[in-house]
């Protein structure tokens, strides 16, 4: 993919950046640079005294950002890394804290649409799915080396696919004959594992399984949990974290972390004084998630599952 072909429609862009309550001289972190939509908007709101740190582990995204953010590079620092390292990144840059952190957990459209990366079930390509091309674990490794129980487990947990065991069985039976090399081969095996009646309704039959394998390859959920907790830790008082999720697993994690960090005293009401010592760390700004507008949904069908949650450091 060339830099110019990296075209990605950013979801909930205005709402997520508004949620950060940008101050022109503040320090902000975009943990998911992607197509640089959010980063471009944040950078445009900063003065020369402000700073944006934009993180991505995908070389394509970073190359694209160097062009898209060229006029703002006096206030932008690009970092190739996984966002789970946000605390170390902030520390290594000599910063004591930041004023806002943004996460957009959607996979960039170019990654989905370009078959060569192995993310898409609509194109035949080598099984890969690595966001970081230097990472050791690929989709090929999972599909051809993990045991049947492990494969079924991740498809169930990360894809919420009720036919996970049948799909895992098809995969293991086929790889006994020869290795499964491509996404096209995997799609056919997934279809064979799902009853015909179930294949005729709902989304593409491979959607949930591909999501599950991608999450496992990139350790997305554990990385996200670590990153949100650490993002809250590095926030300055009144700093905000904006999180856009695209499926229920991510949204539940975000909601639970916000709830846990917003809890104050947990002593029984009858206690005359607090003995637990618990203090709220954040206040939740969005009691209910912000959803895309009808106009955005009409323009971008991939926005339909997006949810935005915002919290503020106390």
UniProtKB/Swiss-Prot annotation:
GO cellular component: cytoplasm
Record GO biological process: rRNA base methylation
Subcellular location field: Cytoplasm
Residues of the signal peptide: none
Annotated keywords: Cytoplasm, Methyltransferase, rRNA processing, S-adenosyl-L-methionine, Transferase
Catalytic activity, as annotated: cytidine(1402) in 16S rRNA + S-adenosyl-L-methionine = N(4)-methylcytidine(1402) in 16S rRNA + S-adenosyl-L-homocysteine + H(+)
KW Disulfide bond (keyword) present: no
GO molecular function, one term: rRNA (cytosine-N4-)-methyltransferase activity
Highest taxon, organism lineage: Bacteria
EC number per UniProt: 2.1.1.199
Functional description taken from the UniProt entry: Specifically methylates the N4 position of cytidine in position 1402 (C1402) of 16S rRNA.
Similarity comment: family membership: Belongs to the methyltransferase superfamily. RsmH family.
Name of the protein: Ribosomal RNA small subunit methyltransferase H
Organism: Brevibacillus brevis (strain 47 / JCM 6285 / NBRC 100599)
Record lineage: Bacteria, Bacillati, Bacillota, Bacilli, Bacillales
């Amino acid at each position: 993919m060339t830099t110019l072909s990296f075209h990605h429609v950013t979801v909930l862009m205005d709402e997520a950046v508004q949620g950060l309550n940008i101050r022109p001289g503040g320090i902000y972190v975009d943990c998911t640079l992607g197509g640089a939509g959010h980063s471009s908007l944040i950078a445009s709101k900063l003065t020369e005294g402000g700073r944006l740190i934009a993180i991505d582990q995908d070389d394509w995204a970073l190359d694209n950002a160097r062009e898209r953010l060229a006029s703002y590079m006096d206030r932008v620092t690009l970092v190739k890394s996984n966002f789970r390292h946000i605390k170390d990144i902030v520390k290594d840059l000599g910063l004591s804290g930041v004023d806002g952190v943004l996460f957009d957990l959607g996979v960039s459209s170019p990654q989905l649409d370009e078959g060569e990366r192995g993310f898409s079930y609509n194109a035949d390509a080598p099984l890969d799915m690595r966001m970081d091309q230097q990472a050791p674990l690929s989709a090929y490794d999972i599909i051809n080396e993990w045991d049947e129980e492990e494969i079924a487990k991740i498809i169930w947990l990360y894809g919420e696919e009720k036919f996970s065991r049948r799909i895992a069985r098809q995969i293991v039976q086929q790889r006994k004959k020869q290795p499964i090399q491509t996404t096209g081969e995997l799609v056919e095996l997934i279809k064979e594992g799902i009853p015909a009646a179930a294949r005729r309704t709902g989304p593409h039959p491979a959607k949930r399984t591909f999501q599950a394998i991608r999450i496992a390859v990139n350790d997305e959920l554990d990385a996200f949990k670590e990153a949100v907790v650490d993002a809250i830790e590095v926030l300055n008082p009144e700093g905000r974290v904006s999180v856009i999720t695209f499926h229920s697993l991510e949204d539940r994690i975000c909601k639970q972390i916000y709830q846990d960090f917003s809890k104050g005293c947990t002593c029984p009401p009858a206690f005359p004084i607090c003995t637990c010592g618990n203090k709220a760390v954040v206040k939740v700004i969005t009691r209910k998630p912000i959803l895309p507008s009808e106009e955005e949904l009409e323009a971008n069908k991939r926005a339909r599952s997006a949810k935005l949650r915002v919290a503020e450091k106390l």
